[in-house]
């Protein structure tokens, strides 16, 4: 592939494996499209797909998968720990190779127009594609979630960019946009207290006076009897993963709580992990050029 765009659509289904297979199917066996990864989480009740491709075939595959999700997912019956406003909650496009951010923005708008036309879904443009500053932050767009969107979408400042000014009865709304790569990073705590996880998340996220390029929220993992600080690192080159890990450790200690593990959701740039490994190993003057796989 000469021109490569990455797309990481998030779907509000993390439990029904048959539905998950049907949603992922449009990304398989398509020329010009490569499915890199998909992961589902039962507690979050969410599916995250990572796919790359040439802009045009990638666009077509994404639109097909959105159609499947709209058909299969009824948010009136959806319960999960992750905030959501749509069956297809968010569809970000990330320029990877020989594609500019401006071209990724244009692609996101093209997809947004088509989603509204085909599936009668209200579409909000966010991040680099946002039509207004207050729509750049996904959390602001999604505030109120599926249930609250019925009234929110009627407000003049929250009219959708494309599609009807009315929440879809079962599929809700969708955010589509272009952005830089982010790392979805979750840190697990040995406490069942969601209040503690929320408090720690508030302390580490930028909006609460914490780390720049860090978004965080507390999540309950009921099956395991623990909680989690769920983090999006929106620019790992400016704020490293280990900084988030260490700040969570410090804040957790105030509550007598420990970290029991962490996880990466989806794919992660090698540089993000090398940076963290260098920090904990105390490596001096280490560079990507010393990584065997990077030289092959």
Q: Which sequence ranges carry the predicted segments?
A:
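Long, contiguous binding/interaction regions
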Residues: 1-296
